[in-house]
């Protein structure tokens, strides 16, 4: 147990075995042996490791069996493997603490997540996603106006939302997964607000549309369309832009961005789609 925890904490900290060894005052070989479970650190070394990794001693003894499944990433192809592992380790740590609190409090944070019953069993074209997005809003009693706080909305519906810092450019937006059968959405805490909102809506699309998309529909394209439709429903796009436009003024898009929390580029895509 300690070995797995040590490796996870080291990965979150972004340290190599040698770097951690220097901070904790032990050899890199000792760190490797601890992580492989070949030897156990003494109490003094464990305290030094906790200090170097900025975690509490209890972290190394936390018992939590976590299974992350059906992961859907929004990342760039050139994202370093080391950074990806760091994100996953941080996410696992946060989810474990979330689930641990549920166990301690002996009560769930919210009602279990459930996809709206009226969603279509099979989506055969992207235009169906316009109505699907409205169905979700209506089922969740959100109306069709701008949604101020998506994170609150998602958490109230049983989705665990995790923010993780990643400032190495824009190589990572987020991902969705199932953690012990609970839906999880992870977003980049360093991204701009409108980008975070789109990622949240996009990943909601993955959670809802998985196994519903017909043959020939690309899941990423479908989730992008759903995200735009969820953030700004079709009736309000037509109301704001009209049924036919050949030009969009930047100032107009800027005002709509601030009202709806959808980027100017996102509004351009909404206009093109409709």
Which sequence ranges carry the predicted segments?
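Short juxta-domain linker segments that transition from a proline/glycine-rich
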Residues: 1-274
């Amino acid at each position: 147990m300690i070995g797995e925890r040590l490796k996870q904490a080291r990965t979150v900290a972004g340290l190599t075995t040698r770097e951690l060894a220097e901070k904790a005052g032990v050899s890199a070989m000792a760190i490797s042996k601890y992580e492989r479970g070949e030897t156990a650190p003494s109490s003094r070394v464990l305290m030094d490791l906790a200090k170097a990794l900025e975690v509490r001693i209890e972290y190394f003894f936390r018992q939590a069996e976590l299974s992350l499944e059906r992961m859907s990433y929004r990342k760039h192809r050139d994202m370093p493997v080391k950074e990806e592992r760091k994100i996953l380790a941080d996410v696992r740590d946060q989810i474990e603490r979330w689930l641990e609190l549920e166990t301690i409090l002996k009560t769930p944070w919210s009602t279990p997540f459930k996809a709206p019953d009226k969603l279509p069993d099979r989506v055969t074209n992207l235009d169906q996603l316009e109505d699907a997005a409205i169905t979700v809003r209506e089922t969740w009693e959100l109306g069709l106006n701008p949604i101020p706080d998506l994170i609150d909305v998602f958490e109230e519906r049983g989705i665990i939302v995790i923010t993780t810092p990643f400032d190495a450019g824009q190589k990572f937006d987020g991902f969705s997964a199932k953690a012990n059968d609970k839906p999880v959405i992870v977003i980049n805490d360093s991204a701009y607000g409108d980008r975070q909102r789109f990622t949240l809506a996009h990943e909601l699309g993955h959670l809802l549309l998985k196994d519903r998309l017909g043959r020939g529909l690309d899941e990423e394209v479908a989730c992008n369309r759903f995200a735009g439709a969820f953030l700004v429903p079709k009736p309000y796009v037509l109301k704001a832009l009209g049924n036919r436009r050949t030009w969009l003024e930047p100032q107009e898009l800027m005002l709509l961005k601030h009202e709806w929390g959808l980027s100017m580029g996102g509004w351009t895509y909404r206009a093109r789609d409709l």
